[in-house]
């Protein structure tokens, strides 16, 4: 028998997080406390839909979450098929069950979970004004990141080109891999021209150059862009297997980016990977502004994929009121240190 308790929490960013959908100052999450009533063991999960972005960012989310948790606790298992439309809820349940079943934060046995190997990550440059972004780029370069991802679309395009030129004046493509994320900021009419201008800086890839939902436009861009395109928002809400196949076969992207909270939980992300690999499409894994509870789950799973290219797993460190986890960014890798003490869940959740 299981019980599932829902603990809402508002997290506060250390500094405003600028995205294409505005600036985040706080972050609403729902923690799930799953308890085995026979053994007393528990697992903690995190449901963290992104406002105006997640397909399950619904007005009645708390009620829906309560109903699903009640049903899951009664059944004793996760209804993966039934939860396809609700990726953030599925991810929270997956995380809670994985934690309980492992009775440890080391959900799977990997060199990462044993503290023997880090996961390479990119240094993320948030949207901001020119001076802010310039300073952040300097910090990431000094910290030793070999892959830097710059969010673009917030300031004038010419100024963004200046920022990329600044990086390339100091580091060649062999020294630092550059990725950009447009978050759908380009118009279909301007996109190819801007991609051609960006190509001057020997970029690894660009995420979501145009707004999601324009499959034919994106298909044409993926076929004609001088450097690779990665789909991100395009995958949101594409939850059924047949639709995933149709999307990949229509657009034929070079990469897809997988965020379990947005793209079907861990189970749904695995399905995306299988379908992508069958088509020769690359991928990497990214967190989506979760706290350390969600970040650890994503990182533990990501490590089972044995990633070689940099992943997007640094965002758990963004909050002033995060829970302490044995996760650390060292150089340009995320490390897990199992010898460190486990988080103080009773105090943090104030319910156990």
Task: Show which residues each predicted segment covers.
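A short pocket-lining beta-strand/turn micro-motif at the edge of beta-sheets
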Residues: 69, 76-79, 254, 279-285, ...
């Amino acid at each position: 028998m299981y019980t599932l308790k829902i603990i809402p929490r508002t997290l506060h960013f250390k500094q405003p997080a600028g995205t294409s959908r505005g600036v985040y100052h706080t972050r609403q999450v729902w923690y799930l406390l799953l308890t085995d009533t026979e053994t007393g063991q528990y697992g903690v999960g995190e449901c963290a839909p992104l406002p105006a972005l997640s397909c399950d960012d619904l007005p009645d989310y708390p009620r829906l979450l309560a109903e699903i948790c009640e049903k899951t606790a009664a059944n004793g298992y996760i209804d993966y098929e039934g939860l396809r439309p609700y990726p953030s809820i599925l991810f929270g349940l997956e995380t809670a069950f994985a934690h309980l079943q492992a009775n440890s934060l080391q959900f799977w046995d990997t060199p990462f979970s044993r503290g023997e190997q880090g996961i390479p990550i990119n240094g993320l440059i948030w949207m901001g004004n020119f001076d802010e972004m310039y300073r952040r780029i300097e910090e990431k370069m000094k910290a030793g990141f070999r892959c830097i991802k710059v969010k673009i679309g917030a300031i004038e395009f010419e100024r963004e080109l200046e920022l990329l030129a600044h990086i390339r004046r100091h580091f060649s493509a062999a020294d630092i891999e550059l990725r950009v994320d447009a978050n759908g900021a380009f118009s279909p009419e301007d996109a190819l021209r801007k991609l051609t201008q960006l190509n001057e800086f020997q970029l690894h890839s660009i995420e979501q150059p145009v707004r999601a939902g324009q499959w034919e436009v994106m298909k044409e861009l993926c076929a004609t862009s001088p450097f690779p395109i990665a789909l991100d928002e395009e995958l949101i809400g594409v939850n059924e297997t047949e639709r995933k196949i149709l999307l990949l076969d229509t657009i034929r992207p070079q990469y897809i980016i997988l965020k379990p909270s947005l793209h079907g939980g861990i189970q749904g992300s695995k399905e995306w990977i299988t379908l992508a690999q069958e088509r020769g499409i690359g991928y990497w894994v990214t967190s989506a502004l979760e706290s350390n509870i969600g970040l650890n789950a994503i990182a533990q799973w990501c490590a089972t994929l044995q990633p070689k290219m940099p992943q997007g797993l640094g965002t758990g460190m963004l909050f002033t009121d995060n829970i302490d986890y044995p996760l650390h960014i060292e150089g340009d890798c995320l490390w897990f240190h199992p010898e460190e003490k486990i988080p103080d869940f009773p105090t943090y959740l104030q319910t156990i």
